[in-house]
Amino acid sequence: MKSSGAGAAFAGASVADAVPLAPLTTLRVGPTARRLITCASSEQVIATLRRLDTERLAGQRDPVLVFAGGSNLVISDALSDLTAVRLANDGITVEGNLVRAQAGAVWDDVVLTAIEHGLGGLECLSGIPGSAGATPIQNVGAYGAEVSDTLTRVRVLDRGSGQVRWVPGTELEFGYRTSVFKRRADDGLEIPSVVLEVEFALDASGRSAPVRYGELAAELEVPVGERADPRAVREAVLALRARKGMVLDAADHDTWSVGSFFTNPVVAPDVYERLAGSVDGPVPHYPAPGGVKLAAGWLVERAGFGKGYPVPDPGGPEAPCRLSTKHALALTNRGTARSDDVIALARTIRDGVRSVFGITLVPEPVLLGCRL
């Protein structure tokens, strides 16, 4: 990696040539970008993207990837002509019960800051890797909570007009792991708008949001629907996530992943009834708008893909990409995986679940230059 000396063209942002992207993602897979532009402020993000989009209109630019934490990306190793723009604007401010975070802020730092200021509402989202700006794009959620529960507005750069404005959360068309941002994106490289800042309105009473998730309630030893100390909820969530390999640890290959690779499918009630009648024992399910939500991890394991799949033969080599030994939904890089290895395993699992149950799992991460 070397500096190109072109930072002045991007309002002082750092510019480097030939930068490997794999170390900048939680899956640790990806190509060497032709150019990496790191923006330390929202002003640098705006200036950089305006310039790159002007170059695009003139037909003079490479494909542009905009990212921050790299926690929800599978980038094809073939995308060697990329200009990557990394959001490193990481300011966090608190005013009363409002928490504002710039797009590049580490998400778990945002959660911890809120809790340290006595604010409840984000604690169930503790330990989720990635950046604050990415959370509204797919309406990040865990343990019965979603970003849309407390998000009031986002500050965005419209790349078509070059304008910057605040957009109310009510206009973001949130759904299960989706939003207007995700639906309008083409292939992850031609996103029409970029989140610069997010704002949350939280509970200043010193209580958590109601604990809606049974596993978390059991960990806290409280009834479902009860509120608790946000710090206690955070610690319980982190403990649950750690046991599932969902807290980043450079020494643990079970955490080299994008988290859950597939979303929990929502099916029609008759599909659920048919499934429940065809297997022994209960089928994990939850009510959802428009149908019944099934547990993707249960489907994966019941289709024959247990934790650690594919398990190496005794004394034999380990596959470069395997399911986590702790969580059946995490596809993990065992140290040498490339994007093709990840996609191949994802296809095998998707096709296997479809063959057994007639249900097609949908990938949760953004796939850049590759597809299932």
Curated annotation (Swiss-Prot):
Enzyme Commission number(s) of this protein: 1.3.1.98
HAMAP family attached to this UniProt entry: MurB
Reactions catalysed according to its record: UDP-N-acetyl-alpha-D-muramate + NADP(+) = UDP-N-acetyl-3-O-(1-carboxyvinyl)-alpha-D-glucosamine + NADPH + H(+)
GO biological process: cell division; cell wall organization; peptidoglycan biosynthetic process; regulation of cell shape
PANTHER family referenced in this protein's UniProt entry, alphabetically: UDP-N-ACETYLENOLPYRUVOYLGLUCOSAMINE REDUCTASE
Protein location: Cytoplasm
Record has NADP as a keyword: yes
Any coiled-coil regions, as ranges: none
Function according to Swiss-Prot or TrEMBL: Cell wall formation.
Active site as annotated: R177, S260 (proton donor), E364
Biological or metabolic pathway of the protein: Cell wall biogenesis; peptidoglycan biosynthesis
Protein keywords: Cell cycle, Cell division, Cell shape, Cell wall biogenesis/degradation, Cytoplasm, FAD, Flavoprotein, NADP, Oxidoreductase, Peptidoglycan synthesis
Enzyme class, UniProt record, top EC level: oxidoreductase
A UniProt-annotated Pfam family: FAD_binding_4
The protein, known as: UDP-N-acetylenolpyruvoylglucosamine reductase
Molecular function GO terms recorded: FAD binding; UDP-N-acetylmuramate dehydrogenase activity
Family under the similarity heading: Belongs to the MurB family.
All copies of domain FAD-binding PCMH-type, residue ranges: 29-205
GO (cellular component) term, any one: cytosol
Cytoplasm is among the record's keywords: yes
